[in-house]
Each structure stands twice: as C-alpha cells, then as structure tokens.
C-alpha cells in the first residue's frame, strides 16, 4: 500500500547481524533485507557511523516527501545476547565482540571524527562526558529519594481521545446500532 499510494515513509530495518542464538546467514537465505521491499527502493548503510545515519535520514526525508516510500537497512552490531538465556558468546567469539568494540563502536567512531576534523578537542569531549556523568548522578540521586509512585499515579498524565467510529460506543466493546 505504501508503494501504491506513494506514502512519504521510510521503513528502517535494524540488522544487528544476529538473531537470538544464531547469525543471520544461518537463518536467512538472503541477508540483504533492504531488497525485500518488492517495489520499494532500498539500500543498506553503516549504522555504526552516526554521521552516515544523520545524513542518510536527511536525504531520506526529502526523497520520501517527493518520491514515496523507502526501505533502509541499518547495518549495526549487537554487543550482548537477547536475554539471560542468550549470553551472546556461544555463536560468536569474544574476540569478534572485542574487535567491534575497539574499532567499530559508534561512540568511539564519532569521537574520532570530531577530533580528526577539529570539530572538538579531546579536552572538550572529556568535559562534556564529565558533565553528562554529573547530570546522571544528580538525576539518579533525586529519583532514589523520590517516593514510590502509587497505583493511582499509573493513570496520571495519560489521556486518550477516542476517535468517533460509527456504530461503536466509547468503551469500544459495544455497538450502538439498533437491531430490529
């Protein structure tokens, strides 16, 4: 429908290379997920690089507004398993994980680009990190001292405006039409 109606939408598939307990190549005959959009054009990007992601999405927005839907596969990496029962090291080596952390980590790559292009100095980045850590510590301390929320708080600041649907009452469980 998106292709038929040329909807301005980008479908994003985050490919972290592993399903639960197995590599993609062992679970799919075609791991080029971007090609599965049928008539929707698609491509793959290196989502470990934040600048590539930013520039791709700026371009994708303009493309979708003019041309219609687009399918983008984000090639990224999952450092950890899915759960306690999936330690994430039975189907890949610790060396592989370490290699990605050391050479392909998005935060590390971004820092390197900022410094290499003279957009920031190492000192400036350390100050930013220090400020972020301080802000987080303050927020955590505040939250730990806040009272526990009550059951009634669960509904605070929650609003629902139900759309009018002909033949349906507001509780969405009973029809308001008459039978004869």
Outline where the language-model segments fall.
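Glycine-rich ThDP/TPP pyrophosphate-binding loop and its adjacent helix/strand module
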Residues: 1-145
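C-terminal intrinsically disordered, low-complexity extensions immediately downstream
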Residues: 144-180
């Amino acid at each position: 429908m998106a292709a038929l109606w040329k909807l301005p939408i980008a479908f994003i598939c985050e490919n972290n290379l592993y399903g639960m307990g197995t590599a993609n190549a062992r679970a799919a005959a075609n791991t080029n997920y971007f090609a599965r959009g049928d008539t929707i054009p698609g491509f793959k990007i290196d989502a470990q690089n934040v600048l590539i992601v930013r520039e791709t999405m700026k371009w994708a927005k303009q493309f979708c507004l003019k041309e219609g839907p687009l399918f983008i596969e984000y090639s990224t990496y999952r450092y950890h398993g899915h759960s306690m029962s999936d330690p994430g090291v039975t189907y890949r080596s610790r060396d592989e994980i370490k290699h990605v952390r050391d050479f392909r980590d998005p935060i590390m790559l971004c820092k390197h680009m900022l410094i290499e292009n003279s957009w920031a100095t190492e000192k400036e980045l350390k100050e930013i990190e220090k400020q972020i850590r301080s802000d987080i510590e303050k927020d955590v301390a505040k939250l730990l001292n806040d009272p526990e929320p009550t059951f009634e708080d669960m509904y605070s600041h929650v609003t629902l405006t139900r759309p009018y649907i002909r033949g349906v009452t507001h509780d969405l469980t009973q029809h308001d039409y008459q039978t004869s």
